[in-house]
Amino acid sequence: MGNITAKLVKDLRDKTGAGMMDCKKALNETDGNVDKALEWLRKKGIASAEKKSGRIAAEGSIGSYIHTGSRVGVLLELNCETDFVARGDIFQSLLKDVSMQVAACPNVEYVSIDEIPEDVVEKEKQIEMGRDDLSGKPEQIKEKIVEGRIAKRLNELVLLSQPYIKDSSLTVEDLVKQAAAKIGENIKVRRFTRYTLGEGIEKNQMDFAEEVASMKSN
């Protein structure tokens, strides 16, 4: 068994937000290996959060984030079970972090895989099935390759599947479940909207010469 020091326990706690006793137990269970202890705690945290996932989360808060330069803005609804938790530092910090994550992920359109419409999934499948590099391959192998590519593509569209911008060893889903384990309540990302300045507006690309010509003709 590795030498489990107080500093090692504290470092693991700082990384995971788990309690001191849980961190010590994780290190004992993994012979003092921090990476394995981190994984052990993550699994424990996820299991803890999943026990709460069936409970109704009807309280919460709507957060906003405006990125530097005011060119990207986000509105995000995060739900929990009680108003008391919604006002707390852990919940509000999570709300801010997830809102920032949305701002940093322009391709994200859905909260979870379950929200992706079937027609979008089917369209992605047709695109992948038609790729040149799959021609001539046996159907069974082709299906397997396409399945992997579709899963990768769909995860790119989903907020909860994104690597957390402040710690890429975690996903956004991990982050939410860690917070749920800390506060002892179910937490759900309900919905979000991302705004980009000028998005959808057709800009007039008229050059200077054309502009002068149009002025003369008036």
UniProtKB/Swiss-Prot annotation:
InterPro entries, alphabetized: EF-Ts_dimer_sf (IPR036402), Transl_elong_EFTs/EF1B (IPR001816), Transl_elong_EFTs/EF1B_dimer (IPR014039), Transl_elong_Ts_CS (IPR018101), UBA-like_sf (IPR009060)
GO CC terms: cytoplasm
Signal sequence range: none
Claim: Cytoplasm is one of the keywords in the record: yes
Main localisation: cytoplasm
Keywords linked to the UniProt accession: Cytoplasm, Elongation factor, Protein biosynthesis
Family annotation (PROSITE patterns): EF_TS_1, EF_TS_2
Residue ranges, annotated region (Involved in Mg(2+) ion dislocation from EF-Tu): 82-85
Location of the protein in the cell: Cytoplasm
Pfam families according to UniProt: EF_TS
Molecular function (Gene Ontology), one example: translation elongation factor activity
UniProt function note: Associates with the EF-Tu.GDP complex and induces the exchange of GDP to GTP. It remains bound to the aminoacyl-tRNA.EF-Tu.GTP complex up to the GTP hydrolysis stage on the ribosome.
Family: Belongs to the EF-Ts family.
Listed name of the protein: Elongation factor Ts
Originating species: Prochlorococcus marinus (strain MIT 9312)
Gene name tied to this protein: tsf
